[in-house]
Design a protein with these regions (language model features):
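Immediate N-terminus of the mature polypeptide
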Residues: 1-86, 90, 102, 107-142
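Short secondary-structure junctions
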Residues: 93-101
């Protein structure tokens, strides 16, 4: 019987696809379903999926999600930014315990008054010296 390979071993094999990447965009190589070949890149897609999902949207997992989209019609304020940071931190702790959030920045956009930018830098607990980051932007209410 073949021995199961660790996540780090799979990360070193460029021929192994670990999961689906987000966003799903059509290209000539992958079609609509781009694959990810490292645990770190798959985790970035999983974080994006978590943050863009409202609780109750996922069948069988009613608490999955961060409810960030529910803040879209609220006016930009310091309280809103704090609430978004809390929602992200809580969701990450609940659903991604294998991820360490190294930096979380939620701030209004400098040029668009109703846009909120989110930058989340993360690493995996199995390999904490390797980092990646995702960014999201939301237009909020006026």
């Amino acid at each position: 019987m073949a021995r199961a390979r660790s996540a780090l071993e799979l990360d070193l094999d460029p021929d192994v696809t670990i999961g689906l990447g987000l966003p799903m965009e059509h290209d000539d190589v992958n079609g609509f379903f781009p694959g990810t070949s490292t645990t770190l890149s798959q985790t970035g897609s999983n974080i994006r999926n978590l943050l863009l999902t409202n609780r109750g949207e996922r069948v069988g997992q009613p608490t999955f999600g961060a409810d960030l989209l529910l803040t879209l019609f609220e006016p930009m304020s310091d309280e809103l930014i704090i609430r978004v940071e809390e929602k992200i931190s809580e969701s990450m702790a609940d659903w991604m315990p294998h991820v360490t959030v190294n930096k979380l920045v939620v701030e209004p956009d400098e040029s668009e008054i109703n846009q909120m930018n989110i930058e989340l830098e993360f690493s995996l607990t199995m390999n904490p010296e390797v980092h990646d980051a995702i960014t999201l932007s939301f237009l909020t209410g006026t």
